[in-house]
Amino acid sequence: MENKIEIKRDLAHVDYESGRYQTMKEHSENVANYAAETCSLSELKILVSLIGVFHDVGKLGRENQEDFEKILQYGDDAHKHGLDHSTAGGRLIKELFKEKSVSEFISTVIYLHHGMGDCINLDNGQSLQQQRDEKQIDYDWIKKEFFQIYDKEMLVEYCKKAIQTYKEMEGKINTFHKESEISKRKCGNRYFFMGLYLRIVLSLLIDGDWTDTACFFQDVPLSKRISLEETQKIWNECIENFEQYMSKEIQNDPSNGNVLNTFRQEISDLCRQAADKEQNLYRLTVPTGAGKTLSSLRFALYHAKKTKKQHIIYIAPFNSILIQNAEEIRKAIGKADIVLEHHCNVVCEDGKEERYRKLTETWDSPIIVTTAVQILNTLFSAQKSCIRRMHTLCNSIIIFDEVQAIPVKCMELFNLAVNFLTQFWGTTVVLCSATQPTLAPIKENNICECIEMAGRPEKYANAFKRTDIKDATELYPGGMEIEDLSEFVKEKTEQYQSTLVILNTTACAMNTFQQLKAICPQEYELFHLSNNMCPQHKLDTLKSIKQILNEQSKKIICVSTQVVEAGVNFSFGCVVRSKAGLDNIIQAAGRCNRHKELGRMGTVFIVQMSEKAEKLSHLQEIRNAQAALQKVLEDYKNNSLKFRDTLDSEEAIKAYYLNYYSQLRTNETKFLIDKQTTTIIELLGENKVGQLQYIRRNGEKVKTKLPQAFLTAGQAFEVISNDYKVSVVVPYNDEARELLDKLSQDYLEIEEQKKILKKLQRYTVGISEKRKEKLGNAI
């Protein structure tokens, strides 16, 4: 049916069903205002606002407007897809600005808001600016129409202010770069930081654009983010609830007054005191079991209140830690509704899926609890949904728990991102770990100097020492076979009642579990844990393990991969850990005699598996870690006094990391790209590969401060290898089977399918293509 309506010629959005439309002026001003209000740096608001005004100017083209008119009259089927909306805005900006670097920055943001791209093409050397300058568009018409909507003189004045804003931004980068160059710690380069600035401004534009567009089609007023005043009120309420919660916990704790709780309180108080300081980069280095989750949260709440931060973002390396600590955070602050838990295993109640989807896209929540994978994707992925929420990291407090688990290949990217957020965007970062990586300077891209939030780590080492770590790697020449390890574990379980075995591969863990089932008495309780189990299976298994450990009525063995190594709150009498990094060994030791409940030292054995039992040929990081640990073990054997007679000393940890980093290949910490002879650090910096191609194409050097290959880098960036991207749903229990039955029904609506698939995530396992082929018809 045809709509009979009056057609305007400056349309930005149209809705056939209702006959409503939004003009270009309405949309561009909404986006400009929303993005500027969201921007946490007041000095950048004018520049961000200007970008909002120009971002969709291309929609004024005659072909675009004809498209909109047809949609209004005949419906969505009349729409011609793929018309360029961004090129005209960038070219108009370049015409208005005399300063090339400023116009290039703004136009690049506009060009990229419909999809990431490379500023210089790695294959043909063409720059993004050249590509858009050569593009055939309805430019003269668009320009004429635009200046009928906007006053040119007013925009010129805005441009002058934006130039000043840009120069201040560039000046900050140059000052930091110069100071970094003359110091012993080179902490980044201007190209990389300029690229991150661009990404955050792009984030603000995308968020504003998507938000206004969604509000138009939903026919609701433009939504507002939580205001600073509302956030301050929330922090006050959280602090009051937190202190009441901790007081009750202390009163109800039967071990109240013991030496561990005294030191936990001291650490918590030091974190509280640090909250009043202006420092923006901290390390919290305390032993496992010292309460760093709640201590760092206490710091964050008080610091957020004092420095008017918008968000507290808690990051954990694994879902197992995240789920456990998210629940602890919710209890402690007494306001579960302000905690956004963002990871793949979250299942929403009926009716709340859309709100959760929106929150995970924007992170518009006071407290966000998420994984290292999610935050690293937010910083470096090419996906627009990741870019959209990046600005949320600004003017926030970010707590990285178990920071040593950040992959080695991401190390320099991580360092530079932390430097950028803390030095330029008012963010405070806390790096938490019992085994902090060394801060000894590397050649370049170091993290800035950190302050220890709770003083020197060795102060608490003796108080929290609950285990003796014993080197048993030489018990079997050539390493233990599965049978040797199983007998060893059985013997230790007879002696210690409960044993946790942590191995480096899922195959070795499963084979050991099967062998133990064959040789252990029936009264033994045997458990197995690995990422080959679906999340619900892991949760149920952990619950059973904790129950038996608490009852202390049976001998128990748990054989696991490193999925239980950090953050899982249970305690065994003995731990057997296959040789890995010293950080892994110490984290594993944190699952032994956790609360000093044994009345003696717990025992942790480091064992060496044979090459046949534990195949590590494809696990380079583990082999590197083993080699670094081997040097520490040899030094300890020759002179244990240099490590204060314990393998978990600060001296041993420092020696381990120095060994580890010294043996890495060139560029291994810069995120090497297999198909390119370059790294992501390079692509997001000077992009020498692209610049060389530009010279070949144009016969001269490129004159730009934005040579980055954002798209190539973003597509290559993945924290976890693509090897495990095949998802398999396991019919683990009745609920899983019922959901699978529903999903197989014919004519199921798309929305219902999405709900079922979301609920099935707790029953889903990631496997490799190779394993999928091996399983064949079994899946």
Which residues does each PLM region occupy?
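Accessory nucleic-acid engagement/destabilization modules that flank
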Residues: E2-S18, M24-E240
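C-terminal helicase lobe and adjacent C-terminal extensions/tails of nucleic-acid helicase motors
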Residues: V102, I106, T422, E483-Y496, ...
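Conserved Walker A/P-loop ATP-binding site and its immediately adjacent core
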Residues: K309-A332
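Walker A/P-loop
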Residues: E278-A300
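Conserved helicase motor
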Residues: V14-Y16, L340-E353, N504-A507, L526-L542, ...
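Post-DEXD/H (motif II) to motif III coupling segment of the RecA-like Helicase ATP-binding lobe
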Residues: I387-S396, Q404-Y460
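Inter-Walker segment of RecA-like/P-loop motor cores
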Residues: K335-F380
